[in-house]
A protein has these predicted regions:
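Extended carbohydrate-recognition surfaces in non-catalytic/accessory domains of CAZymes
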Residues: 23-142, 223-247, 251-256, 380-381, ...
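Accessory beta-strand-rich segments of carbohydrate-active enzymes
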Residues: 24-35, 52-56, 86, 114-258, ...
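Substrate-binding/catalytic cleft of secreted carbohydrate-active enzymes
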Residues: 430-596, 610-613, 623-637, 641-653, ...
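Extended acidic/polar, glycine-enriched regions
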Residues: 178-182, 282-381
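Active-site-adjacent substrate/metal-binding segments within catalytic domains
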Residues: 85-130, 134-142, 148-155, 160-161, ...
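Bacterial Sec-dependent N-terminal signal peptides
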Residues: 1-26
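Carbohydrate-binding surfaces of carbohydrate-active enzymes
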Residues: 281-288, 585-861, 865-875, 884-888
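Short glycine/proline/serine/threonine-rich loop/turn segments at secondary-structure transition edges
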Residues: 134-137, 177-181, 195-196, 330-350, ...
Length: 903
């Protein structure tokens, strides 16, 4: 067993390294045998989409969807996309994410609540050719998502109506398309039935801003945050994201088609050494023959020497569910299965299931899906009745966050990949799909499977909005979504709503469709308490557990607990005019902060000023990164300390509020909307590394956290303290034995010498029993006394003005560039050659315009180097991002900037 865990540990480290150097992963959902009708505009697809306001033409759908219909007066359209996205692209309206352009009082972009639904009701149209290879087959048109209702016309024929944002529709267009010729597709898209008003209501979730406008947006099954929320625009998105927001594709099958394959795993306990697999798939006979069809479905688990088949008859128009059970097919009992594990707990083993259906020996259709074998359960058998999760029988401490979708659905594979790669780098292990958002893409779930990220899925109801008025529509959207995502091992938990209730029948439907995952009615029940804090507080309050006005929140399972970070100065310059940046224009900054919700122009600014008053936006933004780093580090490390049974109180999980920025905002998180990381990403990644030494600003103690399912004995943690002149004034070490998935709390106490400088620094080093450094950590601290939660005082919060007295340091930098496939790497080695600490250094990868190349992936950033210390960092980006040149920059608090032209 000892050799096994050593091997597992090595595998985990190798996997972690490979994850962070594997760019441009293929989107497996993009079947190359399909015709994908992506627009030329924005998506670089092959199809010219056009759009026109429905009220601006009197032509009927029959005419608009004819192949010779003139569209010279129509506008280019973005598909997938929304009406407003296309109107902004065509310069009909200004960029909503800039300054106060979107502010309803600015009257630059009409709000649907004021101009009515017809204003944003649009026709979308394109033409496509059906290849000769489709001749004699059934041709299908698949629409993955339209918001909110739609008429689908092909060659003059109304073939379908779509209702609800999360429905996948499959339309048999065989009798209506022309093989080898141009065909016309026209989709008339209607906005949500009840757009709601951005005016606040008198009711809502306790202690929060007036989110969700007047609440009526909730009468629809849609993306509820479009009417306004405090983490985005409080006055919402003007068209409520009306449009064809997901892909449209065309494919062909034989007489019989397959859809919605599902594979269920039942693991034998307690050893989890055997899996019983149950496979099911829907078989669709869309032929017009009255005689029915004899067909055969064959299946295999690829590479495992497991195959199975079944013959049966499907009558005209029948949609038959065919099931293969392990009782009927013993080969579906798998011994010693390779289990799937989340971040840090084991490898992300995945299998492929392939199914075909044939008639008279000729294959009509095939489907393939990936799956993982694992069991995820939870219970409330804890000291405080809080919910705790288990993976494959082992307890899992949740270090999660709340995923927020892009506000205007400006999605791309590049954005999805970058955000999930940053997520994996951060060490987070679960993403909550917050109930006012969306159900994410197949590519999103594919990457979560590969990266070991668990997903908590909610279903589009919140406590700030009313409930859907059409229950059948809501339930059909839930059904469509569950069938789409249920094979993903990353999908861990179902929750009906955010801070609300459930639609009657939801748990029964989920059990019928899946039955392998846990469920709770809403996000704050059944062992999950209510959240907070949400905005800036004194970082000392996290250690004291007084950060929330609702009382203790560092305990049990907290679904929403977080703090903001200022974006970097380059990004701030992209979101508003220079005159609004400095001095800070409170109106503009507050609008880009959910009407000031996160206190960026008040408390955040006050705390930044504790590093010394700034004279420019550049100086303010640099200091703002220091505060953002402390915000993230203090939250994660206090939860580390209280992990499960090891701290002052029982904690089973935290979901940081919130994960990603839905639009440009001055209150960002680990990265901003433009995919440029902040200091919070790297300080979160440090805090959530699997073996981690950390300092408590309130207790002055050092603890060591272990996130692996194995113990580590005879490790050594060392604490060093340096004064403002970089003299080492304290050093002490302690031996630590790290329990499996546990914490060695208060391993040593730092005794700060009398007369130590007002500002000083702490370096923590963790070494294994052979003396090899495993991890390190770095803090800045002041002598200020913490005077309580109503103040902005304390050694993590105030008294940092003397940082300006840091003497100059020198860092020697060397780099090498290399190319692998489509990717470009810069391998950087740095060494502090001076006797002074090089404080808070930032590497930048810039283009010729001195703008950050995005997305780029840095293995570390915003770091400090003690005298003589060495560090290596690798930066990676796609080669296609280098068309405007590339420059490497190193800058820091007390070093001279260095610039190197790379291309």
């Amino acid at each position: 067993m000892h050799n096994f865990v050593k091997t597992l540990f090595s595998v985990l480290l190798l996997f972690f390294c490979s994850v962070l150097t594997a760019q441009n992963r293929m989107n497996d959902a993009r079947d190359p045998n399909r015709i994908w009708l992506d627009s030329e505009v924005t998506h670089h697809g092959d199809y010219q989409w056009k759009m026109m306001k429905a009220g601006d033409t009197t032509d009927p759908g029959e005419k608009i969807s004819s192949s010779d219909y003139p569209t010279e007066k129509w506008l280019p359209a973005i598909v997938p996309g929304t009406v407003l996205n296309s109107l902004v692209y065509n310069q009909k309206y200004p960029e909503p994410y800039y300054g106060v352009n979107n502010k309803i009082e600015s009257k630059l972009i009409p709000d649907i609540s004021q101009v009515g639904r017809d204003f944003y009701t649009y026709w979308f149209r394109t033409e496509f050719a059906v290849p000769q290879s489709f001749k004699g087959k059934n041709v299908w048109l698949q629409l993955d998502g339209i918001n909110y209702r739609a008429e689908v016309w092909v060659n003059g024929n109304l073939l379908s109506t779509i209702n609800g944002m999360f429905i996948q529709d499959y339309i048999n267009v065989t009798d209506f398309v022309k093989i080898g010729k141009n065909n016309a597709l026209a989709v008339k898209v209607y906005p949500v039935d009840v757009p709601g008003s951005t005016k606040p209501k008198s009711w809502g979730a306790a202690g929060e801003f007036h989110n969700g406008g007047n609440g009526n947006i909730g009468l629809n099954t849609t993306m509820l945050m479009t009417v306004g929320w405090d983490f985005t625009f409080m006055d919402g998105i003007r068209d409520r994201n009306t449009g064809i927001w997901k892909n449209i594709s065309i494919y062909a099958t034989g007489k019989v088609a397959l859809r919605h394959p599902f594979i269920k795993s039942e693991l034998r306990k307690p050893d989890y050494d055997q899996a019983r697999e149950t496979v099911s798939v829907e078989v669709i006979n869309s032929s017009t023959s009255n005689s029915g069809i004899n067909c055969k479905v064959k299946g295999e688990i690829v590479g495992e020497n497991i195959s199975f088949e079944k013959s049966f008859r499907v009558i005209r128009g029948e949609q038959k569910l065919v099931t293969f059970s392990p009782e009927e097919f013993p080969q579906l009992v798998m011994n010693s299965p390779r289990l799937w594990w989340p971040v840090n707990k084991g490898p992300q083993n995945l299998y492929d299931l392939k199914l075909t259906v044939s008639v008279d020996g000729v294959i009509c259709d095939s489907v393939k899906t990936r799956f993982g074998i694992r069991e995820i359960t939870s219970d409330t058998k804890t000291p405080d009745k809080s919910r705790v999760f288990y993976v494959n029988g082992k307890r899992l401490f949740i270090r999660g966050t709340n995923w927020i979708p892009e506000a205007m659905l400006r999605h791309s594979d590049e954005r999805t990949y970058a955000e999930l790669r940053y997520t994996r780098q951060s060490g987070v292990n679960l993403l909550r799909m917050w109930g006012g958002g969306i159900a994410e893409s197949d590519y999103f779930f594919q990457l979560c499977d590969e990266l070991g990220l668990l997903v908590w899925q909610e279903f589009w109801m919140t406590g700030d909005t009313r409930h859907p008025h059409d229950k059948a529509l809501y339930m059909s959207n839930v059904e469509s979504t569950v069938k789409r995502i249920r094979n993903h091992p990353s999908l861990a938990y179902y929750v009906a709503s955010n801070e609300s209730t459930e639609m009657t029948g939801t748990p029964e439907l989920l059990n019928q469709l899946d039955g392998t995952r846990g469920y709770q009615m809403q996000s704050e029940c059944a062992g999950v308490h209510d959240g907070s804090p949400y905005k800036q507080v004194n970082p000392m309050q996290h250690y004291e557990n007084t950060a929330s006005p609702r009382g203790s929140r560092v305990d049990g399972f907290n679904p929403e607990y977080g703090a903001p970070t200022l974006p970097t100065v380059e990004i701030l310059r992209e979101m508003m005019d220079e005159k609004d940046l400095w001095p800070i224009n409170k109106e503009v900054w507050d609008y880009l902060d959910g009407n000031g919700f996160h206190l960026m122009t008040t408390m955040y600014t006050d705390l930044v000023n504790h590093y010394g008053k700034s004279s420019s936006i550049d100086e303010f933004a640099q200091k703002g990164q220091l505060l953002g780093a402390i915000n993230s580090k203090s939250i994660w490390e206090v939860w580390n300390y209280n992990k499960l049974d090891y701290g002052d109180r029982f904690c089973s999980g935290l979901l940081f509020w919130y994960h990603n920025c839905s639009m440009r905002q001055v209150a960002s998180r680990m990265w901003d909307w433009s995919l440029e990381p902040t200091a919070s990403l790297y300080h979160t990644a440090n805090s959530l590394e699997p073996l981690h030494a950390q300092f408590d600003y309130l207790k002055n103690t050092v603890s060591v956290v272990n996130d692996f399912y194995r113990s580590f004995d005879n490790y050594k943690v060392t604490a060093q303290v340096y004064d403002i002149n970089s003299r080492k004034v304290f050093e002490e070490s302690a031996a630590v034995n790290l329990p499996a998935d546990g914490v060695a709390n208060d391993a040593l106490t730092i005794r700060f010498p009398d007369g130590i400088s007002q500002v000083h620094f702490i370096k923590l080093i963790l070494k294994d029993k052979k003396g090899k450094e495993i991890s390190s950590n770095f803090y800045w601290r002041s002598n200020d006394k913490y005077e309580g939660k109503t103040t902005l005082t304390g050694p993590a919060a105030s008294g940092f003005e003397d940082l300006s007295k840091l003497r100059a340091s020198k860092v020697k930098l060397a780099y090498k560039v290399r190319e692998e496939g489509d990717n470009y790497f810069v391998d950087i080695t740095m060494r502090n050659t001076s006797n002074q600490i090089a404080f808070f250094n930032q590497l930048q990868f810039l283009n010729a315009k001195m703008s950050p190349i995005r997305p780029s992936f840095y293995t570390d950033n915003f770091f400090s180097l003690t005298p003589g210390e060495k560090k290596t960092v690798t930066i990676e980006t796609a080669k296609e991002k280098l068309s405007e040149g590339a420059m490497l920059v190193l800058k820091g608090w007390n070093i001279d900037s260095q610039k190197y032209k790379l291309k």
